[in-house]
């Protein structure tokens, strides 16, 4: 869900060493981008979630797709999680605005939604299981692009999943907005996005974008 630009989200820091309410099981190894990690071995974890919806009005619109990737705080390790298309009715899809009709139709998502047998509740439980497995005792922060909108939809339609996260969000859109004002040259060199408007693709692009800002703008400690 990359079409919003959020210049007003507040960036803050939390005690990320505080334990989660529920910890994951341990023992099984999971492959990551940089090798294998024990379950729950992601330090200062970021839980990247992206939703595709029928629109942006949380009171009437519904979730069509949810994807999740977990990284450590340094963005050097990651594991890809569920990438789920959620069943919604044809009547629900017919009420989408022109933008959603066009883009979700072109991406193939609309057709996949009608063929899916996964409910919102089932999708929520699969993502919760994945997050708890890999976060362990860490206190995860929700991350993404304009992720405050995704968080609103999670609170309404997937409240148990939303409850895993504090109010602090790692919003790449906010970082981008600040870089455009303070480091405009570097901002213009940020990786271009394909804007496929599919949840997992959007997360991968968001992580790539934040890695660029980390390397280019947020200098390493001396």
Swiss-Prot record:
EC number(s) recorded for this UniProt protein: 3.1.15.-
UniProt cross-references to Gene3D superfamilies, sorted A to Z: Ribonuclease H-like superfamily/Ribonuclease H
Region of interest: Disordered: 19-38
Recorded GO MF terms: 3'-5'-RNA exonuclease activity; nucleic acid binding
Chain segments annotated as coiled-coil in the UniProt record: none
Ranges for domain Exonuclease: 46-210
Keywords: Exonuclease, Hydrolase, Nuclease
Source taxon at top rank: Eukaryota
Biased composition (Polar residues): 21-35
Annotated active site: 167
Classification via SMART domains: EXOIII (SM00479)
Function as written in the Swiss-Prot or TrEMBL entry: 3'-to-5' exoribonuclease specific for small oligoribonucleotides.
Assigned protein family: Belongs to the oligoribonuclease family.
Stated name of the protein: Oligoribonuclease
Organism: Arabidopsis thaliana
